[in-house]
C-alpha cells in the first residue's frame, strides 16, 4: 500500500515510493532537531570541520492524516516545541507538552507507520503522560529497562514494556514517584542509579520493579544549604563515581558529589566544590579528565577557553596550579641581565603568579599575556630546562558537615540526639 511514481521502465526498481498527497505528510526540517557531525580531515581541510545541518526525516508514504497521523504532538499541523530527546531501545524518543513518542525500531528518522492498515511491533510508539493534573515533560533519561520521564509538575513517570520488549502494543507509561525537581538541569545517570536536583538538594532515585511507587532519597541531607538554589551544566566521572554540576547564579563554582560502594551499599559519600577564577559555561568528562569551556572578559570582549582538569592527579610531583600549562615553545637566555624568557604559545592567563622549572619554584620578574601567547621572565640561566609548569596558585579550604547520627547502612537519621 502507498503512493508510487514510475522512475524507470527498463531497470528495477520500476517504482519509487513517494509521500501521500494528504495534509501534514512531512516534517518541517527547520523546526525539527538538527544534527551535528564531524567531517574527517583531508587534503582540502587538514583539521576537519564540524557541520550543523538539518535531518532528512521520513515522509508519510501510506495512509492519510487520519489513519496515519504521525506524532500526536503535531496532530493536524499543530506547532509545538520539542522539549526533550533520548535514545532508548534502538528508538529515538522525543517529548513535548505531555506527549512522549518514538521513532520506528532501528530507524530513528521514521515517525510514521509503514502500513496504516497493519501495525507491527517495530512501528512508532506514542503515549501521553496522564495524571490528575497536567504534566509537561521536561526531560527523558534512559534507565535500566525503563525510560525515566521527568515533568515540571513534580511527577516522575516511567515508560516500560513487557517481556523485555517495548512496542506499540506493550508500551506502558505510569507515575512512579512524586518529587519536585530543578527545571533547568536534567537528571543524571551514574552507574545504575538516577540522580536529580532540586533547590539546594540532590536526590537518588531507586527503581524497584516489585512496587508501583518508587522512592527517592536525599543524599545532601547532611550538608544543608551547601548546594546552590539553581543549577546550570553538569557531567559525571564514572570511573570515580562522581557527579559535577555548577551554580547558575555563580558560574565560578563547580560542585561535586562522590560516593564509594561496597557491593550495592554506599559506605561513604561527600560533597565538595571548586571555585575558579572564571565562569564555567559547559563541562564534560572523557576518561578520567574533565573538560571545561570557560569565559573571561577584558575591556572589550568575552574570551572563551577550553581547559582540561585531571580529576585525580596520581603524580604527586606535578605542581597543583590553576590554569596550569606545561608546553613552552622557546626559552631564551639573555646574558646582559642574566634572565631567561619562556614563551607559551596558545596560553592566555592574565593571573600568572607561579612558574616551576625542573622542580624548582622561581620568582617571576615579569610576564605578559597576549592573544596568541604568554611570556614569563625569570632570573638565571634556564634555557636548557626540561620541564616547566606555569599557572596560578590557589587555596584549598576544607568544610566539614554537621554531625549526624546514622543507621547501620550509613543513612542519616532525623531527630534529636541526646548524649
State where each predicted segment sits.
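Residue-identity detector for glycine
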Residues: 2, 48, 63, 70, ...
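Predominantly extracellular/luminal cell-surface or secreted proteins
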Residues: 5-9, 16-21, 102-108, 159, ...
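Beta-sheet repeat architectures centered on beta-propellers
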Residues: 26, 135, 201-419
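Intrinsically disordered regions, especially transient/low-confidence alpha-helical propensity segments
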Residues: 47, 54, 90, 415-416
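Beta-propeller and closely related beta-pinwheel folds
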Residues: 57-153, 157-285
